[in-house]
Amino acid sequence: IKTFGEGATAILAQSIGGGGGFVGASKDGVALGGETQSNITAGDVTVTNSSLIQTTGKASAGLIAQSIGGGGGVVSITESEKISFGGSGLINADAGSVKVKNTGNIATAGITSPLIMVQSIGGGGGFTTTSDQTPALSKTNLIRLGDISSQRSKAGSINVENSGTLFSSGRSSSA
């Protein structure tokens, strides 16, 4: 699997209960997540990869696997004013377990392009990237990660098995 260009993640597997998803870019406000919801459950996520994965663009992860109860997801921003990233007033917003088994080689070259990202998040959160052109935050700019006044939300277990070679050359691009 090879991708080129900004925000071009190779594999994105998500189970999100009550909101979230993937937003490539926005010039205006962005809101990801549920509000005033109860008993939201995201399912389990399992990814098995044996292929070669290569990405070259900014904010282009190799593999992302997420189970997020009640909000969150993936946002890649180049120009943004307001971002609300998570839930509000969520009750029992539970995430499932996430399992990744990778035997393939993964290489990313862009900035903020993690090789493998695995998350189980109850009630909000996720992954946000910004570019070098993103304006500095001021009173009119806002980035909020996480949930507000959520109750009894919990995350599931995470299991990652990797026997492939991982290589990242971009700034802020972790394994």
What are these regions (language model features)?
Residues 1-175:
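Low-complexity, glycine- and small/polar-enriched segments
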